């Protein structure tokens, strides 16, 4: 479902809000039908705050990495035009980032790690499937080499978040790390590729 909704939202309907909200509604529907909503206790800290907070903030390194490697990636100029076409302009970027920060990490961790994940210490297929749907967004704009790099990084991230959940018996630290990564990456895209001066 994520693959279809993201593709339909971005490349057929051409609306980023439709894509992300449709994706989230799909997660809510599937998790509800499966009866897989985690209990509130799963979001209680599994470690002390002085461990959880620094670990969570480490996710910001994702944005730093994107900023540093963006010149090397040499994304197609069409990416900036597509962002505008998808409805991401000066008026909508900040609400989009806030929505993504507050909603996306929680739903993705519930869907990909809690419901479809496992306590296996080895990589599993779900880690790769989670990484793969991101490539739908990027495939038209970056080279195959960088698509492979992104795929490996995201697969590794999915695996790492599962291990944190397994060791801590809590979803909090991995979700906050995910949140920091999402926000930092979106802020970099907004500041470097976003149409800051579009009305």
Go through each PLM region and give its residues:
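Transmembrane helix-loop-helix hairpins at the membrane interface
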Residues: 93-199
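Non-cytosolic membrane-interface motifs at loop->transmembrane helix junctions
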Residues: 18-23, 80-88, 144-152
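Cytoplasmic-side transmembrane-helix entry/capping segments in multi-pass membrane proteins
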Residues: 23, 47-57, 116-124
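Juxtamembrane "helix-exit" motif on the non-cytosolic side of transmembrane helices
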Residues: 8-14, 68-77, 135-141
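Juxtamembrane helix-loop-helix connectors linking adjacent transmembrane helices
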Residues: 40-104, 195-199
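Alpha-helical transmembrane segments
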Residues: 1-9, 55-63, 125-129
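Alpha-helical transmembrane segments in multi-pass membrane proteins
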Residues: 1-40
């Amino acid at each position: 479902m994520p693959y279809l909704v993201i593709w339909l939202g971005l490349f057929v309907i051409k609306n980023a809000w439709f894509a992300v909200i449709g994706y989230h509604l799909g997660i809510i529907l599937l998790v509800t039908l499966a009866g897989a909503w985690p209990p509130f206790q799963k979001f209680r800290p599994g470690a002390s705050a002085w461990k959880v907070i620094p670990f969570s903030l480490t996710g910001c390194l994702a944005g730093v990495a994107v900023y540093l490697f963006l010149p090397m990636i040499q994304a197609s100029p069409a990416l900036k035009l597509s962002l505008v076409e998808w409805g991401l302009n000066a008026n909508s970027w900040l609400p989009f980032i806030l929505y993504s920060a507050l909603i996306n990490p929680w739903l993705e961790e519930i869907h990909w790690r809690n419901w479809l994940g496992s306590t296996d210490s080895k990589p599993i297929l779900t880690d790769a499937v989670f990484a793969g749907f991101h490539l739908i967004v990027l495939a038209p704009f970056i080279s195959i080499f960088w698509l492979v790099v992104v795929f490996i990084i995201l697969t590794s991230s999915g695996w790492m978040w599962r291990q944190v959940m397994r060791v801590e018996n809590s979803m909090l630290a991995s979700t906050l790390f995910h949140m920091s990564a999402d926000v930092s990456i979106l802020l970099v895209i907004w500041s470097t590729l976003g149409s800051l001066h579009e009305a």
